A protein has these predicted regions:
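Acidic, Ser/Thr/Gly/Pro-rich intrinsically disordered interaction regions
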Residues: 1-243
Length: 243
């Protein structure tokens, strides 16, 4: 089996990882103290209340950065495919990474004439299962998200802002408890008898973004998903580099 030059695919993957770090830095900036109002007070009864308000506006910039990361992840797969078919006599400019919506369709794509895959390589790619419900479902989702991002910004409406704190209330202890609201909203985090209440760590801001696209499972957090997809691509590159 020929050796494959996958350096271009690796460069695209590294560029995608830089964009993923950009996403994480942008999210970290959204935990700036000036974007949160946290109040700790007693109400009319002998209770202590912790309320918070978030001052975030809608942020399409985040969706644009996420789209950049997804675009480079997707491109790295096409570059990978080009590196595989070139020594087999194929034309890298005329092939794309195989995807399908089910197992039958995926196996058909793997065996498509333009790829010129040898039987051994067919076995390798069959195991990738880049289809909905397959082992490579993250790669399948990246492909679907990339197709969406080519026409509009990805929807990450689920911007959640919150606070995290630890406290004792009577004989009960609560550690690193998070309370979330939709970004730009306000909410009540804690209400407890004041006489028996003590913070062990004071409230600190948090921020989280999740996909709101039908091709990604509900409540999928953006950062971890992108890292996982990048790791899947890296593992695939490693396996082909060892062939």
């Amino acid at each position: 089996m020929p050796q494959f030059n996958l350096m271009d695919a690796r460069l695209k993957l590294e560029r995608a990882r830089e964009h993923i770090l950009d996403v994480e830095r942008a999210v970290e900036n959204l935990t700036a103290p000036e974007l949160y109002k946290i109040s700790i007070q007693r109400d009319e009864s002998p209770y202590l209340s912790v309320d918070f308000e978030t001052l975030h506006d809608g942020n399409q910039y985040l969706s644009a950065i996420i789209g950049d990361a997804i675009g480079n992840l997707r491109s790295s797969l096409d570059y990978l495919m080009g590196g595989v078919v070139k020594p087999l006599g194929g034309n890298p400019a005329k092939v794309t990474f195989p995807f399908a919506d089910n197992e039958k369709g995926f196996k058909g794509e793997v065996r498509a004439a333009p790829l010129l895959l040898t039987p051994d390589l067919v076995d390798v790619f069959d195991k990738i299962e880049a289809y909905e419900g397959g082992a490579g479902r993250n790669l399948w989702a990246i492909n679907k998200l990339r197709n969406i991002d080519k026409h509009r910004l990805l929807i990450t409406v689920n911007h959640l802002a919150g606070i995290k704190a630890s406290w004792r209330a009577g004989s009960s202890t609560f550690t690193n408890c998070g309370m979330w609201v939709e970004a730009g909203k306000q909410g009540k985090a804690i209400r407890a008898p004041a006489a028996d209440f003590e913070f062990t760590s004071y409230p600190t801001p948090m921020f989280q973004i999740m996909f709101d696209e039908p091709k990604v499972p509900p409540f999928t957090e953006v950062g971890p998903f992108l890292h996982l997809a990048a790791s899947d691509i890296d593992s695939l590159l490693q396996s082909l580099e060892k062939v």
